[in-house]
């Protein structure tokens, strides 16, 4: 088997894959050429879409991203090619980022950081507590699961929004669907988006949904920037709504320097950095996932995290224990 690794792994992880599949040909190349693509059976990573990936010989594409929307478009891959995403890899890193944003807003850390530059000792007279708060997590895959797991340490009441209602989910007090948002948003102190991109999720948080939220709620997006309408968010912020907005993803990336979103004291923007291969937990999990899936492929077994080309979601969702 010929395996191409173009994922942004470090030398240790790349070497681990090479050593595990010592009897196979493993090519490590961050920027593969069309000639490379034309010769391999498996691609590990997200190859550039300018390359022709629609190849009958390509057995599997093992993405290093949780999202797969660019690769499920008709004609991008051959119908015989299996596609998997990296769900499970990012949850730990992103959940820490979310908690950090929540604490930053609740304890006014951004305000104090700005005051430090001026040598200004001015205690804030407002704040929020995460303890005993009501949290709505929209999109309960691995990232939502890891967020909920950590928030349980704060004794939060957690509502998970999924496509389909399930009787029980780990670390969740209540399970609902998108259709229930109008009822749940007015009750939620924190709303956290960890959605993949699909036709149904684009601008799901428009003016109507944003105004359904508590006026002093905190909104955080670590899923896809397209889930929130920037134009509507700016309008709502100008009306004095929302205590804080944490954005690790936005509609247009990088966010233009001219965007009004940069100017709000109660908005915290990070450059799509909550998850990524800089984090050891991400690299470790993804490397093990890749090894397992190549073994599954060789043994003609079902692949983990296989993507449904119709929905863009995983065919089977499992949660870590």
Where are these regions (language model features)?
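Conserved beta-strand positions in the Rossmann-like core of class I SAM-dependent methyltransferases
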Residues: 159
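N-terminal glycine-/charge-rich "phosphate-binding" loop or analogous flexible N-terminal tail
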Residues: 1-41, 321
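Rossmann-like adenosine-cofactor binding region
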Residues: 165-260
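Short loop/helix-cap segments at secondary-structure boundaries that form the rim of catalytic
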Residues: 15-19, 34-38, 51-56, 71-79, ...
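Glycine-rich, N-terminal phosphate-binding loop of Rossmann-like dinucleotide-binding domains
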Residues: 47, 65, 195, 222-223, ...
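Phosphate/diphosphate ligand-binding glycine-rich loop within oxidoreductases
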Residues: 41-116
